[in-house]
Amino acid sequence: METHFHEWQKSLQLIQQKSEELQREQIQLKSFERELRIINKWFYYGLHYEQKLQLARHPKRPTSLDYIEGMSQDWIELHGDRKGSDDQALITGIAQVEDETIVFLAHQKGRNTKENLQRNFGMPSPGGYRKALRIMNHANKFGLPLVTLIDTPGAWAGVEAEKEGQAHAIATCLQTMFSLEVPMISVIIGEGGSGGALAIGVSNWMMMLEHAVYTVATPEACAAILWKDASKSAEAAEALKIGAEDLLALGVIDEIIPEPIGCAHQDAASMTKRLKQKILRRLKQLKILSGKQLRAHRAERFRHLGYYVE
């Protein structure tokens, strides 16, 4: 690069110096970005269970609809349980994802306070599970693969839900999912809480996002039951083994999907692309099996949960 300039070249010299300055800054910026990626990766490695729970409940974490709409060319939501209810906490529908026509069942939290009130914070009522049951049977009738996205603190436990038969609605979903003869994949994208999560989680392949949680009861509820003190939720979370790594080691889930640096809410587009690739890959493998083989595979998978030898 030229270093000697005549007087009439001064303006060119200034531009060249500015260019060199910007290049140095660009190099520094790239170096800083590399360091930031390393720090971010280290920062989110080995989080405590309570911290994972906070990430799973992050208000900006992508919802089921964010993923479905991001993955599909056209999403058609199917409404109602045909018994007078259309629960907004559990959405159902059909979508075209590349070459696959997929039926989705998904918990849906709100993206803001108003939506959360409409969707009951992602806690389905019996009508929601009856709607899911209706759509499951549609998927089975037409031979369409079923994908469920799980993100709920649990099924709604209010008095009205009990009056409407919450336990029966969940039990019927569980029974039906074991009988379906189509490929079934479940993905825990945020909170997987109690029977409310399990009700749409009987599948051939269970995946879980890196910072999602899956538990028999919320840590707060567990602490209140065991120690009569909800403030001991951190100890309860530790005892429940709610994180993806422990659940993979225990055989409760089959695969962990890594999240982008800084978690899913920092790069929803990248997370959606990753989730889509995983779902399509697993569906391709499951579609090789016959209906009877899929049923047997599902039953065998659940029979081995909690299995141990003394």
Curated annotation (Swiss-Prot):
GO terms for biological process: fatty acid biosynthetic process; malonyl-CoA biosynthetic process. It is an enzyme of class 2 (transferase). Keywords: ATP-binding, Chloroplast, Fatty acid biosynthesis, Fatty acid metabolism, Lipid biosynthesis, Lipid metabolism, Nucleotide-binding, Plastid, Transferase. Its EC number is 2.1.3.15. Pathway: Lipid metabolism; malonyl-CoA biosynthesis; malonyl-CoA from acetyl-CoA: step 1/1. It catalyses: N(6)-carboxybiotinyl-L-lysyl-[protein] + acetyl-CoA = N(6)-biotinyl-L-lysyl-[protein] + malonyl-CoA. InterPro entries: Acetyl_CoA_COase_a_su, ClpP/crotonase-like_dom_sf, COA_CT_C. The keyword Nucleotide-binding applies. It is found in: Plastid, Chloroplast. The keyword Iron-sulfur does not apply. One of its GO terms (cellular component) is chloroplast. Component of the acetyl coenzyme A carboxylase (ACC) complex. First, biotin carboxylase catalyzes the carboxylation of biotin on its carrier protein (BCCP) and then the CO(2) group is transferred by the carboxyltransferase to acetyl-CoA to form malonyl-CoA. Acetyl-CoA carboxylase is a heterohexamer composed of biotin carboxyl carrier protein (accB), biotin carboxylase (accC) and two subunits each of ACCase subunit alpha (accA) and ACCase subunit beta (accD). Belongs to the AccA family. This is Acetyl-coenzyme A carboxylase carboxyl transferase subunit alpha. The gene is accA.
